[in-house]
Every structure is written in structure tokens, then in C-alpha cells.
Amino acid sequence: MSRPALRWVVAEGETLALGVWLDRHAPGSQPSLGDGRVFVNGKRITDPGYPLEPGHCVELYAARVSDGEVRVLARFEGVVLVDKPAGLATEPDHAGIAASVVARAAELLDTPRAELHAMSRLDVGVSGVVLLTLDRGARRRIEALRDAGRVRRRYVAIGSGGPNPTSGVWDAPIGRGRGTLRSAFGRDAESATTRYRTAAQAGSASLLALEPVTGRTHQLRVHAAHAGCPLYGDPAYGGPKRLVQADGAVLTLRRIALHAAWVELPFLGGVRVESALPAALLELWSALGGAAEDGASALE
């Protein structure tokens, strides 16, 4: 393991829950719990309620930098669409210790980072199309289109189980859950709607085509889990972290099986900006017994 980016020793009188302690010493770093980047006395801790005692050593590791590269897919009228690899944050870490899509895109475009604004945010373990704006006018235009429901987004996911019925609409409000997680019908829940379709099945697994109507935090992950098909590689919401194959080999999932496959904007004349399904998801679907051509059905 690499060296931690930040390390503290809990002082006398700081008998606090880990989440509260992080808020005090590293504001904005609580998402690192869900990412598995916080250790106490050498043990990975994901529970924000974990009790700290004086003398405990708390270590915060930087987010794992993805091996993939950010690619510019399209640029027009103050809008940039880029391809995000899994393992890379969309925006800089709140603790200031992680690389990000925004930072890399700024380098590629030779643009000051402060001028780029992420209009769509993918979780660290998710890949695909991210929409950025270069100026305030473009930001307002995209916000207006999004509020009017005219920005279409298609995600492809692999669920450990299948929804019943196989297609339809998930309409469950999403609120706060434990720590930084979200929960269907959780605290302070807000309306959340996702259109879904089962593109293919392989045993108990399902290849899902998802279109979010709203944009709540972790919406697709929460809705899939609530529907009984948590996503592979998403243990935070009950998804499997490993897959034991027929020959006994164990496939460890290092990302969430969720990919932002395309975005469609009205001023593109109906043209979709696409990101190809990543090899890791194709490999997983094949290992589950799925067919190579199933991916095309999920993109339709």
C-alpha cells in the first residue's frame, strides 16, 4: 500500500465518532470512508459511527488514480464532453489530495481549471461521458435544458439479480442513509425517477439500460439496490465485490459495474456523444455467461 496522504493521532478528549472527527479535521473528506480510504490503527474503516479513542492513529489515503486517460469526445459552444475512466474523481477531492477529470480536462484544453464546471458528476468507481461547461452562458443553457428534461443520458449497468418487471420506471424518493450513503425513502428524501430496461440476462445477473430522469446522488445505484438488483462491484449498496467463476477462479471487481454510455443534447441535432463500453464490464458480463452482442442492445 502507498503512504497515506494525511495522518493524525487522536488527542486526549477527542472521543468522537470517526465521521464527526473527519468533519472536524478534514472537512469534506467523509466520502473517503465509502471509498475505503480511511484506516484506524492500520484497519480499513467504512463506518462513520466507528468510535475513536485517544491514541488511535487515523490515516487518509489519496484516491486511487485510474490507469485510464481522460479523452475529449466533443467540444462546441462552450460545452465539452469527456470520457472518464473508472477510478478517477470527477472533481478535485474536498481534502485537496486527489486527481480529477476536471483537472485533467483543463490540461488537455489548455484552460484554467476554475473555468471548467462539471454539469454531470460520476462517482469514482463509475466510467463514461461527463459533461463540462467552459463559461457561465453554457452552464445556464445546459441547466435550462436539463430542467426541461431535454438532456438524455444512457447508462449501462450489470445487476446481481433482475428487476421485476423487466422494464419500467423506478420512482422511489432518495434521502440520506448511513454516513455518506443514500437510501430509498431515507431522511429528507427527494423525488427520484429512473427509466430502466433489462437488455439481457445471464443466469441471475442482468444487463440494464438506465436513463435517470432526475439527478440525485447515487440515484442509479440506490434504485437498482432497492429493486433487488444491486450492482456488481458496489458493496456499499449490497452488490458483490467478487465473482467466483465456473473454473474456481475468482474475479475481483475493482470498479462499479456502471457506465455512462451516451449523452444526447438537442442542439446536437439528435447526435449522441458516446463512450464505448469498457473492457472490465465486457469481461464481467462474459464471466457471468452473457453474450458479447448483448452490449449493443443496452445502448439502443
Show where each model-derived region lies.
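RNA pseudouridine synthases
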Residues: 1-300
